[in-house]
C-alpha cells in the first residue's frame, strides 16, 4: 500500500464517508457534524503545536476533527458511544497507523487519568447534552484529587453553544457571570478562541457555537 503519509492525505471527503456509512447526526446524542476541513484544521491549531502530543477527543462522530488532529501530528484517543460511527473511525485508524486509539464508551464514566501516563490536551466538539457536565468535571479535578493542580491535562479546547461559551469567559459583574465562569477562572485562564456559525454544522443547530480555550494557572487565582 501507499506510505502512511500518502494514505493520510488521500482520505475521501467527510461527506462521502458519512454517506457510505449511512451516518446522520443523532439528536438524542446531541450530535452536530462539521464537514469544513479548513475550519477543522483551524480548530486543531488553537492548542498550539500538537506534533507528538497526546490528545483526548470526546464524541468524534465520523471523525472530522479527529482527522484534523491527526494531520496536526497528535496521537489521538477518542471516546465514542455511538457505535454507528466506529467503522468510519476504524478507517482513520488504518490511515494513521498507531496514532489513533478509539474507545467505545461513555466519556462521563471514563477517568482520562487511566488513559494517559503523562500530560494530554483535550480537544472536542462536545455533544451538547453532556458538554457542561464533562467540562465542570475536568475543572474540578478527579474525585479524591481535587487539590492536585495543575491537572494532568495541558489545555482544553472545547466547542459549546455561544451562550455557554460567553458564560465561561464572562467577567465578574457582567450579566453572564455565574457558576461556570467562577469554576473556569478560579484556577485557569479561559478565552473565547473562535465563533463558529451554525451553517458550518450538519444539521445546523438553532444557535451559534464558539470554541473556548482554557489553560490551567500555576496557582488558583485570588487564593
Where are these regions (language model features)?
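Catalytic cores of RNA-modifying enzymes
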Residues: 2-223
Amino acid at each position: 500500500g501507499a506510505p502512511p503519509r500518502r494514505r493520510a492525505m488521500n482520505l475521501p471527503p467527510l461527506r462521502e464517508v458519512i454517506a457510505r456509512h449511512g451516518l446522520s447526526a443523532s439528536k438524542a446524542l446531541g450530535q452536530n457534524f462539521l464537514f469544513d476541513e479548513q475550519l477543522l484544521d483551524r480548530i486543531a491549531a488553537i492548542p498550539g503545536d500538537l506534533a507528538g502530543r497526546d490528545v483526548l477527543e470526546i464524541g468524534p462522530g465520523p471523525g472530522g476533527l479527529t482527522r484534523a488532529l491527526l494531520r496536526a501530528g497528535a496521537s489521538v484517543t477518542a471516546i465514542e458511544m455511538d457505535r454507528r460511527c466506529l467503522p468510519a473511525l476504524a478507517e482513520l485508524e488504518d490511515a494513521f497507523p498507531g496514532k489513533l486509539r478509539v474507545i467505545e464508551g461513555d466519556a462521563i464514566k471514563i477517568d482520562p487519568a487511566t488513559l494517559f501516563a503523562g500530560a494530554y490536551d483535550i480537544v472536542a466538539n462536545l455533544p451538547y447534552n453532556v458538554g457542561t457536565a464533562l467540562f465542570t468535571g475536568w475543572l474540578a479535578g478527579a474525585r479524591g484529587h481535587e487539590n492536585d493542580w495543575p491537572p494532568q491535562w495541558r489545555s482544553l479546547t472545547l466547542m459549546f453553544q455561544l451562550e455557554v461559551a460567553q458564560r465561561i469567559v464572562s467577567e465578574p459583574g457582567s450579566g453572564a457571570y455565574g457558576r461556570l465562569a467562577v469554576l473556569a477562572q478560579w484556577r485557569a485562564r479561559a478565552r473565547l478562541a473562535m465563533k463558529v456559525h451554525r451553517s458550518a454544522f450538519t444539521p445546523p443547530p438553532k444557535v451559534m457555537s464558539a470554541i473556548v480555550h482554557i489553560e490551567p494557572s500555576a496557582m488558583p487565582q485570588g487564593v
